[in-house]
Amino acid sequence: MDYIVFDLEWNQCPQGKAKENPRLPFEIIEIGAIKLNENREETGRFHEVIRPLVYRRLHFRTKEVIPMSQEELMGARTFSPVVRDFLHWCGEDCKFVTWGSLDLNELQRNMDYYRINNPLPYPLFFYDLQKMFSLLYDDGKSRWSLEDAVKYLGIPQSLPFHRAMDDTFYTAAVMQKMDLPAVCGYESIDYHRLPQTKQEEIFRDFNTYTKYVSRPFASKEEAMSDKTVLSLRCCCSLPVLKRIRWFSAGTGTYLALIQCPRHGYI
């Protein structure tokens, strides 16, 4: 198996959110990737700038963050042939590695927009290295910037940040420095493609917590009448002593409280 460490840069509507295409709020303009083998040794690179077809001018925020000229964009290939080459380069036996949880979702959203068949496995598990870094070096909840993580690990900063290939280089360097076996069980789940049936629903045990990804429901009432959604249990599977059933906390969030004989209140 190979690791595909990758980073994307994207543009948004230069005329503001009111005029954006709701099917494509962010249009990918650059892909950078490094392939690592099982020993985390580099075996290949992929990099290409992409000519945008929806938002042809760079948003002012994009210009501020990404050192890229309009001329560089206009001389590039478009998304469809680039992403097909990228996926072919990745190969079939690979695990994606990103800094943060957004890149895979945006990659697939762009593929959907251009009607490109999605060959990625389902469910799609990947390494969110930003989360795993926090689990190793912080509280597991904070999210460090890539630049701060590079500084913390003492990695030489020979390249600027905020270009896809450069950020990929640093992400791979962080991965090579980390104690990956200590956190490799904490995979992330891609939510771009949700379960469509009860049989496809995802259950994952991470030892200290569990994750359940349900199929979409037509309404809140339908979701809150489903027995699996309503079930309350600790990840250790011991019978709970007390429970306060699900209640609304506002803004679409629901909370519940249980008392586990081993772990206390959850």
Which stretches of residues belong to each language-model region?
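Active-site-proximal helix-loop-helix substrate-binding element of RNase H-like nuclease domains
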Residues: R57, R61-K63, Q70-L73, Q130-T168
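Acidic, Mg2+-coordinating catalytic module of metal-dependent nucleases/exonucleases
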Residues: K95-S101, E106-M111, S145-N207
